Amino acid sequence: MHQYQDLLERILSDGAEKTDRTGTGTLSVFGHQMRFNLSAGFPMLTTKRLPLKAIVHELLWFLKGDTNIKYLRDNGVTIWDEWADANGDLGPVYGHQWRSWPAPDGRSIDQIANVVDMIKRNPDSRRLIVSAWNPAEVDKMALPPCHCLFQFYVANGKLSCQLYQRSADVFLGVPFNIASYALLTMMVAQVTGLKPGDFVHSFGDTHLYSNHLEQAKLQLTRAPRALPVMRINPDVKDIFSFRFEDFELVGYDPHPHIKAEVAV
């Protein structure tokens, strides 16, 4: 995954020093794009180990429309703990907006169900979009969505996805986001009878926190290894019916984990 290594190098060489909400400080660039051909392997970072369990369960949690961390905690995933309130609630974050976007007339809009249906009925549509950025509810969210809008595209029997990420924690968050949306693209492709195409990752404020710089430099000393293969249970034909057991990552041989503190 040279694309990710190239991004680390760009930020370290060209990044501007900026302050941020957490008070940590960042090196930041504005505007970047990476493209991953999903037929060339599953884009799971190999220059450090990533936890597949957390990535898959978080995505399934989003697709459930859930915004309480109980499901995550029950499955040993703690990545949202810092932002939850005493009851485990996060407010109307990703899952709520994906599955229950509130309409002015009181209805709830299931954006995921709608986009899957539209891909099947009108694959050439330019409206195959899901948005998590709801200005009316941002202030109620424990953390406003960083990966805030994605669009699907169908051509030659293949499904591609482009994600726009307004704010990108490149060392900790972005590797998760790449794997998560690549997997989502593969899942949607399967349930719509298509092959996976490309995952395109577009960024706004693209940054390394100041307490991640040495870790990023260490990661750049490591050569990327061959990408693994993601196997998905072919019997699942409904986007909301996937379970953790339906996914198998084959041939994942990463370099060791690199510890870094999350900026809250």
UniProtKB/Swiss-Prot annotation:
DUMP binds at R21, R126, R127, R166, S167, A168, D169, N177, H207, L208, Y209. It catalyses: dUMP + (6R)-5,10-methylene-5,6,7,8-tetrahydrofolate = 7,8-dihydrofolate + dTMP. The active site is at C146. GO terms for biological process: dTMP biosynthetic process; dTTP biosynthetic process; methylation. CDD domains: TS_Pyrimidine_HMase. GO terms for molecular function: thymidylate synthase activity. It is an enzyme of class 2 (transferase). Keywords: Cytoplasm, Methyltransferase, Nucleotide biosynthesis, Transferase. SUPFAM superfamilies: Thymidylate synthase/dCMP hydroxymethylase (SSF55831). Its EC number is 2.1.1.45. GO terms for cellular component: cytosol. Its main location: cytoplasm. (6R)-5,10-methylene-5,6,7,8-tetrahydrofolate binds at D169, A263. It is found in: Cytoplasm. Disulfide bonds: none annotated. Pfam families: Thymidylat_synt. Pathway: Pyrimidine metabolism; dTTP biosynthesis. HAMAP family: Thymidy_synth_bact (MF_00008). Belongs to the thymidylate synthase family. Bacterial-type ThyA subfamily. PANTHER family: THYMIDYLATE SYNTHASE, THYMIDYLATE SYNTHASE 1. Homodimer. This is Thymidylate synthase. It comes from Bradyrhizobium diazoefficiens (strain JCM 10833 / BCRC 13528 / IAM 13628 / NBRC 14792 / USDA 110). The gene is thyA.
